[in-house]
Swiss-Prot record:
InterPro entries xrefs: DUF4092, M60-like_N, Pep_M60_3, Peptidase_M60_dom, TCAF
Lipid sites, type N-palmitoyl cysteine: C17
Pfam families: DUF4092, M60-like_N, Peptidase_M60
SMART domains the UniProt entry points to: M60-like
Protein name from the UniProt record: Accessory colonization factor AcfD
Gene source species: Vibrio cholerae serotype O1 (strain ATCC 39541 / Classical Ogawa 395 / O395)
Gene Ontology CC terms, in alphabetical order: plasma membrane
Function, as annotated: Disruption in Ogawa 395 results in decreased cell motility.
Gene: acfD
Length: 1520
């Protein structure tokens, strides 16, 4: 992945930047050359001896492993493959800038080279080879800035800033010590990253119950459970066929009786009675065949193929046990098994009853058993034990089994909760899609988007809809390869914000809503029926694709989508992406097993036709596969006895095309004419034999009518049903297509649209209101839901207005603008393209169109009711003029139908097609999965990741609560509650109950694996070991039980690792707290530490008196980590910790509580100066307060606190020894208070509790209000995060040192700065910048300079010039902070605060050199809050309080006013608040927002002097 970092480079280094030329190194003609990093370096000359120099083929790597692509040029050639002569030097450049020189790297006399193909490593270049530090730092730089996929590395920079950053670090910092270089890089990454996750379809592997009212139509809204059975091929007459019965190793089984409606016999014996011993038997296609030994039923199967495996004769255990029984009694050699006559004779002595005597349904080991009505259960293995006693033993002894090996030795030990086929299917899909780095590294080609052809119909000039016929897998011999999504956001790719919520309502994101649109993900995506399926017949494969047009892709893989032709054997077009070529390369590789194109492909298709406009077949071409797929395409007239080694693949069509024989405008010319089949019965039989012998067949056809023709027999034999009728892919532009009057539409190019909900009548007032309410907390309530009126669900619409035109005709206009209608054109009407090859937008024309739309909607004040939308990441906002990027697919005609549709493919999409199971089987599967990892693969069974995640998510719903689950042995156990409650009892020392107990065998396994402590563990016996750091993907059961322990106190977790045990038990008693509420800032609240600790699972009591409002008691301040991806992969503590209770007020004055893990106790509320709390059963925690230890450092709790006048600091108690901290804990507390004072100063706040607009966040007049900083072993996001409390990811229990220095901690300043940031600096894009103003102030104030920006400010001038007018939008947090640093440094010499005060300056100003530049910022803060200030000598109207202008303009106006200098050029160059927009398939960013002309005009109207010193030119920081 690419990690974007920020710095500076020269203009010539950029990719595609305007007005810039590419600079290339000058290479002397004699082969020597200069080195840009070492200009004097020459060399590489070898004497000419009259023999041509050998030509050497080269590739360039970073380190011998990571291979560069064409982004790096070496000797002006692609670095992935370039050639030089032996005596040449090698010069490598990126965008014309020299990066490496190799002086005569292949001097044979020097290097001993003896091959013609070589690999160079960049770190071995002349510039780096002699310096290990430079080599290490170069690799750090490359790996942080480049894009890496597998073993490929690419240095294509997406922005000016990336390129300049790379250059800066490359040229100036490679000699830094590695640690410093790494810190500088990662600091930049962290800073800039701050600037800028389904329920799947679920097919249980148990027999479903039938529900009345269902339909067998797979496209109906209520489909029956066994609907797939109705798709099986049913012959219209008898089709005699020959098959074989095999064991799992492919050996034929002889001597087994078989019968069906049409046949009866013994395997391996022909109809004449001849013993063939080939396992053969005759059948009629489609019959149900049963197999037996005399009357003992081995099972049955449907006869739709020619090879039948005995394990397929029954479900799971029944099939496996049938094979085990055959193995037990048969005589076996390498190729065959024979049931002796003796076995049949003995069985015949027990007719029918033998089926009761020997049960094939008994499980072996801990397996899942079908107990009927969709229920399963884990039961002990009993199959072989039945032969130890009773009649089964007598029969067994009479036969004297030839093979007595145990079932578990040859067959799987258990049935997994998820079929083992699922993981195999996932692997195959990954290969066919090229979906993972792993398969790509093995040569499978990535398919990013899959092309869906549209029907060749013509309505209003538009082509037809997307066409992909369903190809449904109806047996486990087949599986879907591709299914299109059918959820209500189907056209939006995974990872992007949804257009609709789960109720198909728009997300209301307008202020003051706090709604954040959900992302499209696996969790909420659903799928239609497959249109590509892959099945197996014997050794071979059959793949079906639901559209005949795909044949044309094989002829012209880059020229098939629209209007393709072939002339003189050459495709006329080559503009289509490689995705479909890659897909078919993967398909042919998988079907043939060949990694090269050196194969012969057979076919019965003479010609292909290319998609074009109109109701036509399209341009015709001979069906000759492109050379990248095969070396020869051979036309076949017969499929009999084909050699699968000579022709490993056949591509077929089953029917002729309708062609011109169409009778309706709805007919599709290239659909199958089912009345004109191309395959006979013998053809199909031959094809089945061909596939069974190892050949593969690929069929791409548009069969619209369900039929039972011969092709259906071929497909059925592979487990596929085809020709169901309707297309299973929706048009890719979304449900509204590109219609301008329909919401959520999309087109080829960007559109501007206003979408809105019409007002509804309020039932109580009769007034017109919006159909939703934005609550005070920012949440949304929909009135029709609240009022339970489902029929009144509002409908989203495109805003429209009506105008009268000539003749008073009323015309409806829609708030819809197609950006393509506003492209620049030359005088001949041709579109003008920019240097990037994109059409240039006529901004003037577009602005007129947007203004026309916006001016059409006015509010009651005559102002525009709408403005342009603000969220550049979300393209489905409502109530504003939204820009929605196009999808680059041309639309056609008056119905705005796209030429084609494409479907996003990738690893996430591949993982979306899996299955799950019930409670009992799920929990057992998770245990077996965990067992697998705990024994390092020696036992247990691993689940593939998709199944693991699905099961895990499902189980979390059932487990993360305190419900009492019960098993009723008198009822069918559909949900598996027996096993489920057994596991709960294992984790609760049998306190879960539920009519079950923990099985001793399971308990022993859990203790042996270290999941639960055994009896030898003393007081810890029965507790669970949380196994920190806990990766749910390896230990899912432990993770789920850890989650449940938060609610279910019967599950006890070992707390020794976290949060820690108590060491002494003294504690409790009375404390009195000042709980008055004088809070001035939310982030410095009045939650009070009590100095008490609640011990895990030990009840404690709290009583209250003196309160005037309820008191909230909180135990443990800790983030909820549940579901956070990175934490879940390495969880260091219980994900949920905090518990809260209320006492006093309307609640009881005294209550008793118990908590699962323990924690410090806090109190909040009360609203009284004297609130008395009485604790019983609690433990003293170390507490330093009022300058002394109220509870000693050696108190029993593992975590303690330092409470200064303005701060609470929470950390492991050993940290509070404060070793190495000058002045110790006392000074630490003072430094915390100094930071609080500096914070108040920076924001120009000097008022106490009785103040108004300038109240301090903390003050002696508000003694119970404090900032809070909590150290924890894990927090929700980042290394730290803001809030109340601020959380820090640092928890070293063994350290005796404090981890924070209040006057030298960027982390502390940064996070508290988030809390306290104020206008006018909080412009768009300043979230991770405005907070750092406080940090920068603290650094300057206490460390003597602004070292954080010291490096970046050096090249600020060049950067701003390179990105003039949008430097803010192009920059990261580091660059944006430099803008403010330049302003501060400018103010250091150009601004005098005394000009604003007649009398003594307030104390928050500092006139010390090096610091006084901050006075400008403090004044701006003050002016923003106070329209008038008696102390300030106002200079006309306070421009910082001007309303009605944007935040960017206000910042510029306020700064200019405060500085009494026209700073508009400075702000215009940086353009704070500007945003970068990236559009599909366009690497060039576009910038919007920021400073406006009207804002500049406001500044100009002040008639201020221009700055004598240009702040943009400042390139250093003051050191003092």
């Amino acid at each position: 992945m690419k990690i974007r970092i920020v710095s500076l480079i020269v203009l010539g280094f950029l990719i595609g930047c305007k007005h810039e030329s590419i600079i290339t190194p000058t290479v002397p003609a004699d082969g020597s050359g200069g080195n840009a990093l070492n200009p004097g370096l020459v060399g590489g000359y070898l004497p000419d001896i009259g023999v041509p120099d050998p030509i050497i083929s080269l590739s360039m790597t970073l380190d011998g492993n990571l291979k560069f692509d064409s982004s790096l040029l070496c000797n002006d050639q692609d670095a992935s493959h370039f050639q030089i002569s032996q005596k040449d030097n090698v010069f490598c450049t990126i965008n014309g800038r020299s990066i490496a020189t190799f002086t005569a790297p292949f001097d044979a006399n020097k290097n001993g080279r003896n091959t013609d193909s070589e690999v160079l490593s960049l770190i071995s270049a002349d510039e780096y080879r002699d310096s290990p530090v430079r080599q290490e730092n170069l690799q750090i730089l490359m790996k942080n800035m480049a894009t890496i996929h597998g073993d490929k590395i690419s240095l294509v920079f997406r922005s000016t800033l990336d390129a300049l950053t790379f250059e800066n670090y490359l040229r100036h910092n490679l000699d830094l010590p590695k640690d410093q270089f790494l810190e500088a890089i990662t600091e930049k990454i962290a800073n800039d990253n701050q600037v800028d996750k389904q329920p799947s379809t679920h097919v249980p592997n148990i027999s479903p119950s039938f529900t009345p009212g269902t339909s067998s139509n797979l496209n109906s809204p209520f489909v029956s459970a066994n609907a797939e059975e109705s798709l099986s091929y049913i012959p219209t007459d008898v089709i005699p066929s020959l098959g074989r019965l095999l064991d799992s190793q492919g050996r034929v089984i002889n001597g087994v009786s078989y019968f069906s409606n049409n046949t009866r016999g013994i395997t391996g014996v022909d109809k004449t009675g001849a013993i063939l011993n080939d396992g053969s038997f005759e059948f009629s296609w489609g019959d149900i065949i049963s197999f037996s030994i005399d009357t003992f039923e081995l099972g049955s199967t449907r006869a739709n193929k020619t090879d039948f495996y005995i394990s397929e004769l029954g479900k799971d255990n029944e099939g496996k046990n049938a094979e085990a029984l055959i193995h037990r009694y048969a005589s076996i050699d390498d190729s065959k098994l024979i049931i002796p006559d003796k076995v049949t004779q003995i069985f015949s002595l027990y007719p029918n009853v033998i089926n009761e005597v020997i049960s094939l349904s008994l499980p072996n080991g801990d397996i899942e058993l079908d107990i009927g009505d969709g229920k399963t259960q884990i039961v002990p293995g009993e199959f072989f034990k039945q032969f130890d006693s009773g009649l089964a033993a007598l029969i067994d002894q009479s036969i004297s089994p030839i093979s007595r090996f145990k079932f578990e030795d040859s067959l799987p030990k258990k049935k997994s909760a998820i079929d083992s086929e699922s993981s195999q299917i996932q692997d195959i899909i990954n290969k066919l899609w090229g979906a993972t780095d792993t398969v790509q590294a093995n040569g499978w080609k990535k398919v990013d988007r899959f092309h869906i052809f549209h029907d060749s119909t013509n309505f209003y000039g538009s082509t037809g809809s997307a066409r992909a016929q369903a190809a449904v897998n109806i047996a486990n011999s087949a599986f879907p390869v591709l299914m299109a999504r059918n959820d209500n956001n189907y056209w939006i790719d995974f990872g992007k914000p949804k257009a609709w919520d789960s109720n198909s309502l728009a997300f209301i994101t307008e202020a003051p809503s706090t709604v954040v649109p959900d992302k499209v993900s696996e969790d909420t995506s659903t799928f239609n029926l497959p249109f590509i399926s892959l099945g197996e017949i014997g050794k071979g494969k059959l793949m079906v694709l639901g559209n005949a047009r795909y044949n044309s892709v094989l002829v012209c893989p880059n020229g098939f989508s629209w209007g393709g032709t072939v002339k003189n054997g050459t495709c006329s077009l080559s503009s289509d992406r490689d995705d479909m070529a890659n897909f078919f390369s993967n398909v042919i590789r998988y079907l043939t097993g060949s990694t090269s194109n050196d194969v012969i492909v057979g076919t019965n298709i003479p010609e292909v036709y290319f998609k074009s406009s109109g109701q036509t077949m399209g341009s015709k071409a001979n069906f000759e596969l492109d050379s990248r797929f095969s070396k020869q395409t051979q036309q076949l007239t017969s499929f009999h006895d084909l050699d699968v080694n000579t022709i490993p693949l056949i591509i077929i069509n089953a029917y002729d095309y309708k062609g011109k024989n169409i009778n309706s405008p709805y007919d599709i010319p290239l659909s199958a004419d089912v009345g004109s089949p191309k395959l006979s019965r013998s053809d199909v039989t031959d094809l089945i034999d061909y596939i069974n012998n190892g050949g593969s067949v690929l069929m791409m056809e548009t069969i619209i009518n369900t039929n039972n023709s011969e092709i259906s027999r071929l497909l059925d034999s592979a487990g596929i049903a085809f020709g169901i009728g309707n297309s299973v892919v929706a048009d890719g532009n979304g449900p509204s297509g590109g219609h301008p009057d329909r919401p959520r539409s999309q087109r080829e190019h960007g559109i501007w649209v206003i979408e809105r909900y019409a007002a509804v009548e309020d039932e109580s007032s009769g007034q017109q209101t919006l159909p939703y309410v934005i609550n005070s907390d920012g949440s949304i309530e929909w009135k029709y839901i609240v009022e339970n009126r489902p029929d009144d669900k509002p409908k989203l619409e495109v805003a429209s207005w009506v105008e009268s035109e000539a003749g008073d005709k009323l015309i409806t206009h829609y708030a819809f603008i197609d950006e393509s209608q506003h492209w620049k054109k030359d005088i001949s009407g041709k579109i003008i393209y920019n240097v990037a090859g994109k059409p240039e937008v006529d901004n003037a024309s577009l602005s007129l169109a947007k203004n026309k739309v916006l001016d059409a909607f006015k509010n009651s004040s005559g102002q525009r009711a709408y403005s342009e939308c603000k969220n550049s990441e979300f393209h489905y906002e409502i109530n504003c003029l939204e820009y929605r990027p196009g999808n680059s697919i041309p639309i056609t005609g008056g119905l705005y139908v796209p030429r084609y549709t494409d479907i996003k493919l990738g690893e996430s999409e591949a993982n979306a097609m899996v299955k799950a199971a019930n409670l009992g089987t799920n929990i057992h599967a998770l245990y077996q999965h965990e067992r697998y990892f705990r024994t390092k693969g020696k036992s247990g069974a691993r689940l593939n990741s998709v199944d693991l995640n699905r099961i895990y998510q499902n189980m979390s719903v059932w487990l993360w609560n305190d419900l009492d689950y019960r098993y009723d042995d008198k009822q069918s156990d559909e949900l598996g509650f027996k096993v489920f409650t057994q596991y709960l009892n294992c984790y609760t020392s049998n306190n879960a109950g539920g009519n079950t107990t923990c099985p001793e065998e399971l308990k022993d396994e859990l203790t042996q694996l270290g999941m639960i402590y055994d009896e030898k563990s003393g007081s810890y016996a029965g507790q669970m070991d949380p196994s920190y750091p806990l990766n749910y993907m390896e230990k899912p059961l432990t993770r789920l039980m850890l989650g449940r322990s938060f609610w279910d106190l019967d599950i006890k977790v070992d707390v020794r690792k976290y949060p820690g045990e108590v060491t002494t038990r003294s504690g409790g008693g009375d404390i009195t707290l000042d709980m008055r509420n004088n809070t001035a800032a939310w982030f410095a609240g009045n939650r009070q530490p009590t100095g008490q600790w609640a011990e895990a699972h030990q009840p404690f009591s709290v009583s209250v008196s003196g309160e005037t409002s309820p008191v909230t008691i909180t135990i443990a301040l800790a983030d909820d980590l549940t579901g956070r991806e990175k934490h879940e992969l390495g969880l260091k503590r219980p994900p949920r910790m905090s518990k809260s209770f209320v006492i006093g007020g309307d609640s009881p004055k005294m209550q008793t509580f118990t908590v699962p893990y323990g924690g410090l106790i806090y109190a909040q509320g009360g609203n009284s100066q004297q609130v008395k709390l009485t604790f019983s059963g609690t433990i003293d925690a170390p507490l330093y307060i009022d300058g002394k230890w109220r509870n000693p450092l050696l108190s029993g709790a593992p975590i303690g606190e330092v409470v200064s006048d303005t701060f609470i600091f929470t950390a492991p108690k050993a940290n509070l020894n404060a070793d190495g901290y000058l002045g110790g804990i006392e000074q630490f507390a003072k430094d915390l208070d100094q930071f609080s004072a500096d914070l108040n100063d920076f924001y120009a706040r000097d008022e106490g509790a009785d103040g108004d607009k300038n109240r301090k966040a903390t003050d002696k007049s508000m003694p119970n209000n404090r900032h809070h900083f909590v150290n924890d072993v894990a927090i929700s996001v980042g290394a730290a995060h803001s809030g109340y409390p601020v959380m820090n990811d640092s928890f070293i229990t063994s350290s005796r040192s404090l981890n924070t220095m209040p006057l030298n901690s960027w982390l502390l300043w940064h996070e508290v700065g988030h809390n306290s940031a104020e206008a006018p600096f909080n412009v768009d894009g300043a979230t991770e910048v405005v907070n750092n103003l406080l940090a920068l102030y603290m650094q300057d104030r206490h460390q003597g300079k602004m070292s954080r920006v010291e490096q970046d400010i050096r090249y600020a001038f060049d950067f701003v010039n390179a990105e003039h007018g949008h430097a803010w939008g192009a920059g990261g947090a580091g660059e944006r902070l430099v803008m403010f640093a330049q302003l501060k440094e400018w103010a250091e010499t150009e601004f005098d605060i005394n000009d604003w005060y007649n009398d003594k300056l307030p104390g928050f100003y500092i006139e010390e050199s090096g610091i006084k530049g901050w006075n400008l910022f403090k004044l701006m803060h003050r002016l923003m809050r106070n329209e008038n200030d008696d102390q300030i000598n106002m200079k006309g109207e306070n421009q910082c309080k001007i309303s009605g202008i944007g935040k960017s303009d206000l910042l510029m106006l306020c700064a200019s006013y405060a500085a009494q200098t026209d700073l508009s050029e400075f702000f215009k160059a940086w353009n704070p608040g500007s945003k970068a927009f990236l559009y599909p398939d366009d690497p060039q960013p576009y910038y919007e927002g920021g400073i406006t002309p009207s804002g500049i005009q406001r500044v100009k109207s002040l008639k201020l002097n221009l700055p004598q010193k240009n702040p943009l030119s400042i390139n250093s920081v003051t050191q003092h």
